[in-house]
């Protein structure tokens, strides 16, 4: 209706830190620890560089009314417990400015993830061929009868990090819609 190509959401650096800790506690890798990205598909997050208090102060100074999700105040959800207890404790007792430091780390990890993703795609081009089960070349996105052929010698010459990432991507391609493919699946 509006002809918009992007959707802007109000995630801020606190949200990013909460997500990063949540992913850390779940045992996520680099992708998860990079946390919330500033741009992902059609979603943009222009406030990711600001802390929640900075946004609220800006709005209050200008008399702008904003909405608060009441469920964010409850401790029923893991993210809220991180928000209400762990991050404030870390800020007060461990490192002042920890949210800013964690966001720096998230940015570095996002850059690292981009690089590793590129390396993984290049390695896939050298090591992986998808067939339709009859030996005919197939798109890896069509997993109904897909068979993944791995050039073993090329695969084994890869760094272990790239091998694991490559296996992860192939399992993901063969299991569309599957959530939570874990480190244990790849081992």
Label each PLM-derived region with a short phrase.
Residues 1-54, 61-62, 89, 119-144:
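Active-site adenylate/phosphate-handling loop in enzymes that bind or generate adenylated species
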Residues 2, 16, 28, 50, ...:
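Residue-level signal for short amphipathic helical patches enriched in basic/charged
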Residues 17-21, 83, 186:
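Alpha-helical structural signal
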Residues 38-40, 84, 103-187:
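AMP-forming adenylation/ATP pyrophosphatase catalytic core
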Residues 45, 68-77, 151-158:
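A short glycine-threonine-serine/GTX helix/turn-capping micro-motif
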Residues 55-58, 168:
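Short glycine-/small-residue-rich flexible loop motifs, especially phosphate/cofactor-binding loops
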Residues 62-99, 104-107:
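Mid-to-C-terminal catalytic subdomains of enzymes
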């Amino acid at each position: 209706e509006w002809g918009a190509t992007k959707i802007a959401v109000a995630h801020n650096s606190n949200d990013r830190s909460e997500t990063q800790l949540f992913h850390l506690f779940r045992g996520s890798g680099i992708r998860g620890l990079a946390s919330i990205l500033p741009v992902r598909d059609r979603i943009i997050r222009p406030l990711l560089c600001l802390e929640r208090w900075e946004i609220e102060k800006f709005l209050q100074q200008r008399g702008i009314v904003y909405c608060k999700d009441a469920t964010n105040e409850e401790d029923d959800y893991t993210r809220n417990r991180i928000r209400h207890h762990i991050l404030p404790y870390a800020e007060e007792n461990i490192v002042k400015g920890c949210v800013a430091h964690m966001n720096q780390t998230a940015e570095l990890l996002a850059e690292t993830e981009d690089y590793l993703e590129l390396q993984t795609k290049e390695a896939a081009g050298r090591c992986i061929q998808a067939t339709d089960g009859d030996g005919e070349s197939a798109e890896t996105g069509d997993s109904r009868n897909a068979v993944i052929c791995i050039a073993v010698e090329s695969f084994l010459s890869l760094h272990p990090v790239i091998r694991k990432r490559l296996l992860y991507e192939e399992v993901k391609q063969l299991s569309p819609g599957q959530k939570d493919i874990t480190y244990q699946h790849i081992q």
